[in-house]
Amino acid sequence: MRSRKSLPRVEQAHLPWHPPGLVAGVDEAGRGPLAGPVVAAAVILDELQPIEGLADSKTLTAARREALFDEIRAKALCCSVAEATVEEIDTLNILQATMLAMRRAVAGLRLKPVRVLVDGNRLPPLDVPAEAIVKGDALVQAISAASILAKVTRDRWCAQLHEAYPHYGFASHKGYGTAEHMAALQAHGACPEHRRSFAPVAAAVQRTVVMQATATIVTTVETTVSVRPAAPRAAEGLHA
């Protein structure tokens, strides 16, 4: 009887397959700063109108980001920018607020994608299939476009905030915890747009409370001393 030789094992190739249709890229800007909203953008690019030079927004100059911002808005099939406010960040925490902003950005798209690609390693809850891609802003053009829209939108917000609170220097540091920003927090305390749930801001708020309480105590003591009645003078003589 002829012996049966074992056949070589054949592994089935698993090729990625995705349903045809529109794909949206999603990214955020502003998770790390001490002030302001976190901004997210969602973009569906038009394959018939390619955009040259799309890349991670952090690797581009401000001028190049501005130029690409306008081109993306003009050529994309649709795009959406959304935010989570400072109050939402302080209530939810920065991670959950970021997921909220991303969810709002996707919901704001005029066209519904069949798939969403998100920069990073976490996904917001969405009603369409989604995939998280680490360093996606450098690998996927739609995510690169979203990173540019989010970054430029937030930088413009910081420029407006600088006009309202020039002593913090928001136009230069964009709300990040630079030495300049930390010194301004030390000197002026927190403004309404600072994130109270972030430790450096919480410390600045606490210092302000202590200083105000100390000033109130000192003022009260000084006022008490100033209105204290004078001691009665000794009689200089008796009168009949």
Swiss-Prot record:
Supply the Gene3D superfamilies for this chain.
Answer: Ribonuclease H-like superfamily/Ribonuclease H
Give the SUPFAM superfamilies listed for this entry: Ribonuclease H-like (SSF53098)
Any Pfam family matching the protein: RNase_HII
The answer to whether the entry has keyword Transport is no
Q: What is its EC number?
A: 3.1.26.4
Question: Which amino acid positions bind a divalent metal cation, per UniProt?
Answer: 27-28, 119
Q: Describe how the cofactor binds.
A: Manganese or magnesium. Binds 1 divalent metal ion per monomer in the absence of substrate. May bind a second metal ion after substrate binding.
The RNase H type-2 domain sits at 21-210
Q: Which cofactor does it need?
A: Mn(2+); Mg(2+)
- The reply on keyword Cytoplasm is yes
Q: Which reaction does it catalyse?
A: Endonucleolytic cleavage to 5'-phosphomonoester
Do you know which InterPro entries this protein is assigned to? RNase_HII (IPR022898), RNase_HII/HIII (IPR001352), RNase_HII/HIII_dom (IPR024567), RNaseH-like_sf (IPR012337), RNaseH_sf (IPR036397)
CDD domains cross-referenced by the UniProt entry = RNase_HII_bacteria_HII_like (cd07182)
For the biological process aspect of GO, one term held by this record is:
DNA replication, removal of RNA primer
Arranged from A to Z, the UniProt key words for this protein are: Cytoplasm, Endonuclease, Hydrolase, Manganese, Metal-binding, Nuclease
Give the primary localization class.
Answer: cytoplasm
Q: Which GO terms describe its cellular component?
A: cytoplasm; ribonuclease H2 complex
Compartments in which it is found: Cytoplasm
Instruction: Describe the task this protein carries out.
Output: Endonuclease that specifically degrades the RNA of RNA-DNA hybrids.
**Belongs to which family?**
Belongs to the RNase HII family.
Protein's name according to its UniProt entry: Ribonuclease HII
* Origin species: Paracidovorax citrulli (strain AAC00-1) (Acidovorax citrulli)
Lineage per the UniProt record: Bacteria, Pseudomonadati, Pseudomonadota, Betaproteobacteria, Burkholderiales
